[in-house]
Amino acid sequence: MLSLVQKIIGSRNERFIKKVSRIVQKINSLEPEFEKLSDEQLKAKTFEYRERLANGEILDNLLPEAFATVREAGKRTKNMRHYDVQLIGGIVLHQGKVAEMKTGEGKTLVATLPAYLNALTGDGVHVITVNDYLAKRDAELMSDIYEFLGMSVGVIVADLNPQQRKEAYACDITYGTNNEFGFDYLRDNMAYEKEQQVQRSRNYVIIDEVDSILIDEARTPLIISGASDDSSEMYNLFNRLVPYLEKQEKEEVENEQEQRDFYVDEKSKNAYLTEKGYAKIENMLKKEGILEEDDNLYSPHNITKMHYLNACLRAHSLYQLNIDYIVRDQEIVIIDESTGRAMPGRRWSDGLHQAIEAKEGVKINAENQTMASITFQNFFKLYNKIAGMTGTADTEAFELHSIYGLEVIIIPTNKPMIRKDHHDEIYGSVREKFDAIVEDIKERISKGQPVLVGTASIEASEVLSTLLKKKKIRHNVLNAKQHEKEASIIAMAGYPDNVTIATNMAGRGTDIILGGNLEVEIAQLEDPTPEDIAQIKAEWLKRNEAVKKAGGLCIIGSERHDSRRIDNQLRGRAARQGDPGESKFYLSMDDNLLRIFASQSMAERVKKGLKGGESLAFGFMSKVISKAQGKVESYHFDIRKNLLEYDNVVNTQRKVIYEQRQSFLEAEDVSDILADIRIDVAEQLFHDYVSAGSMHELWDLEGLEKALKSDFMIELDLQKLYEEDDSLGEEDLKRLVREAIEIEFVEKTKNLDSGAVRQFEKFSLLQSLDTHWREHLSSIDHLRNSINLRGYAQKDPKNEYKKEAFELFSTMLDNFKYEVISSLAKIRIATEEETQRAQQEWQESMSDIKAEHESVIDNNQRHDEDEQEEAPKVQQVRREGPKVKRNDPCPCGSGKKYKQCHGKVE
């Protein structure tokens, strides 16, 4: 019934395309009129549109004219005319949706339409790509169009200094990577002067490869961190001990004889010790003198040892050289499992990177303490409007809509897509599969057909390369080890009988043109004459026709990826813009996807039914594969959804802190803010020693006096005052405490330079807030890591997490207020030498931060010398008494820690 209705009225996607086609017709009707305009008249349109917006007109009304303007500018500056389907894509992006556009349909050109329209408001447009190369390339390619129309274009890449970043963000349209935009947001919320902040409002963002950024990278938050204590000795110790542990093939074993020391869960990439393993590692640690004879690993004080052990166990059992990482220049370089790209400068978290460094015998770098963090899910929600482009979003439409509120619209291709997708072939073993791939390649290149082979790992690409060399088949390899040659390898991939092996082509961002890349060939000529160019074009046309006759580019997948989307991205490299093409996947029952997620009984039946070299290729197996991929996709979706639910708790707190911090930063004078905080602190302090409505006999006036003296440098004899006038009630005493704190502060600062005092007040607020927020993030991390244990007590971990996170946040805010007022109570005029020393120490402490993408760290830091020169000048003020830390003995002499005595907030 549903299919019948769809045939009559069309699907939702078809109805949407039909609706926006009317807008496209209007844009097309304007083309003759805009073609008649002079360059100056066309350029003047930008000023006209901005005036109309200022007078109350809305962007939707301007859209047809603005798109017609960009189309005409594209024709004049780039000799590129936006097709009708590209106009549809632009409308989809303007409306805050995801446009699924096949490879070769010109997504880079499409982005110019909504980018120009939305930049007319003056609030800026961000265009996000997956790497620096694509950001630079796209900005350079499209800058002629934007600049012709009077729009400024900026690019954010890793090596820019703060001033260059600020200038790039001030442009009408700014290109850059998701990591750079996210890290700049976090750094801006760590700045100590307004001038150090580089970003402006987050108005409208267009995300290229939106599925890769919002889904593949959503599980790993962006983190700004600073180095913590050196723990290389412990990693080296456990790295030496872990190889003595034996692996158990599955979690449950039938008898004790089969039990080993640990087992792994490949789905979640975790390793777990058995009871036998715990006993074995405890004995080894006791022999090493790390554990006492009567001690055990379950003890709370050994939690850090368990951290090192688990990290090393995962490093040895789950992460493999040339598959998950490579060693380059004595450093561990992560390989992105989705794209196959090496990611230099990035690091795994939770001690895993240090454990792998120990495993491979390279220098172990210190772990890091979180100073600021955010997930991509919550970062992009900060924008007023989000839009995205990709070649493969439909399979992830549910997640994009449920988490980001983004609707996916499939854009028709400009020319019909004629790729031929063959059935998968499944073999009993990996070797048989690779032999079949080699024979297929041999047959295809014999007729001049170019072949692109997609592999899931560097190891697989090198195995296949070795087999091809034995057969004397010429080929190129593109993986994380050959990343420098990427552009030239891709440019050659469409040549007749060319063979290219690539590790996960997803996100490569370069079209493979049949016959080779003509533009690259022309660019390589030195001072070419028109005759040279004509000859190159003629030769290219011959090659192009020859490849088309041979069947176009053939895509061969050496195994199925966990996600159907990544497989579709690989397939999408063939048959661009109406060209012919083919695709085929070769699998074995030993491939990770089928081994981990297909049922064991089915796998055994298939293996028994296959004789040496035989394969299966029919619909039933396609269903099995799709079902296995569906399991993986569902599993990963649940992880991302779960991460978001937990991060939303911290995100609410982050918004409060960052908004409060920004108000401190922008205020010229924070004295009114501090006056309000002093009232809160006086109230808090008073009720620590005098419970509301309690009897006089229960008042601890002596303790209150000691706290006033040690924390606020105030001598106030409350007991004497009460003895002299026993009519003084609770409210009277509270007022005396409040007035004493206020008067003492006025007296302390009345003879100081007011500018220096105001500067120090702001600095103290920001520094104290940052310190407490950083400690709070650490507490939240510990809470998050342990909260699932509450399930054993029949409690809902998420509800417990929300409740305790709120309590931690409330306590953190109270402690922040108390400490900042206590700090300000101890200031005095400092010498010039002391001022310089304090300033230098602060600059050094802030120059050591790193930007991480949890699995991943970006070491391109923005805290260079230019920024340090702008650090807050803490002139003429310093503490009079020593700062009391929360874990120090309380100065009152009780013997308790400060946080449990006078630093305690009920």
Swiss-Prot record:
One of its GO terms (molecular function) is ATP binding. It holds the Pfam family SEC-C. Residues 896-906 have a biased composition (Basic residues). SUPFAM superfamilies: Helical scaffold and wing domains of SecA, P-loop containing nucleoside triphosphate hydrolases, Pre-protein crosslinking domain of SecA. One of its GO terms (biological process) is protein targeting. Its EC number is 7.4.2.8. ATP binds at Q86, G104, E105, G106, K107, T108, D511. It comes from the Bacteria. It is a peripheral membrane protein. Keywords: ATP-binding, Cell inner membrane, Cell membrane, Cytoplasm, Membrane, Metal-binding, Nucleotide-binding, Protein transport, Translocase, Translocation, Transport, Zinc. It is an enzyme of class 7 (translocase). One of its GO terms (cellular component) is plasma membrane. PROSITE patterns: SECA, SECA_MOTOR_DEAD. Belongs to the SecA family. Part of the Sec protein translocase complex. Interacts with the SecYEG preprotein conducting channel. Has a central role in coupling the hydrolysis of ATP to the transfer of proteins into and across the cell membrane, serving both as a receptor for the preprotein-SecB complex and as an ATP-driven molecular motor driving the stepwise translocation of polypeptide chains across the membrane. Monomer and homodimer. Part of the essential Sec protein translocation apparatus which comprises SecA, SecYEG and auxiliary proteins SecDF-YajC and YidC. This is Protein translocase subunit SecA. It comes from Francisella tularensis subsp. holarctica (strain LVS). The lineage of its organism: Bacteria, Pseudomonadati, Pseudomonadota, Gammaproteobacteria, Thiotrichales. The gene is secA.
